[in-house]
Regions:
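Non-heme Fe(II) oxygenase catalytic core, chiefly the N-lobe of the double-stranded beta-helix
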Residues: 1-107, 112-139
Length: 139
């Protein structure tokens, strides 16, 4: 915890949204239902604190994601990769995971500032309708 308190994560959308990323041309050819446009801007990187304080609760949350966090600024690559793998495994431990079972007319809300989310299926054979609303503070 002490070592990560002021550490900055190197974030990029390249793993998902670059031409060769998970949602790039090969994924599109495989029949993905959503039209995702890849872009070279996905190759850019941005630094973000690894440990962030939630502005409402004051609680500290990890801000790392296997899809977006490439490493830790200023750390040797091997140490950075080892720590990233540890953090990814830590945040996916069963006591931190909520899995939802959908039913008709259900509404689910979450706070992206303190969790990661993923669609893991479970709706095969059913119509999937998603309305996304993003609420943000003005900067």
């Amino acid at each position: 915890k002490t070592r990560l308190r002021d550490a900055m994560g190197i974030h990029s959308a390249r793993r998902g949204y670059s031409k060769d990323g998970a949602y790039g041309e090969k994924d599109r050819e495989s029949g993905r239902s959503m039209a995702i446009k890849y872009d070279d801007s996905a190759l850019k990187t941005q630094l973000q604190p690894i440990a962030r304080v939630h502005p409402e609760t004051g609680r500290i949350a990890l801000y790392v994601s296997p899809g977006y966090t490439l490493g830790i600024e200023g750390w040797p690559q091997d140490e950075s990769e080892e720590m990233m793998m540890y953090l990814f495994q830590h945040q996916a431990r069963p006591e931190f995971v909520y899995s939802h079972r959908w039913s008709t007319d259900m509404l689910l809300m979450w706070d992206n500032r303190c969790l990661i989310h993923a669609a893991t299926g479970g709706y095969e054979g059913h119509r999937r309708l998603l309305h996304r609303i993003t609420i943000a503070e003005r900067c």
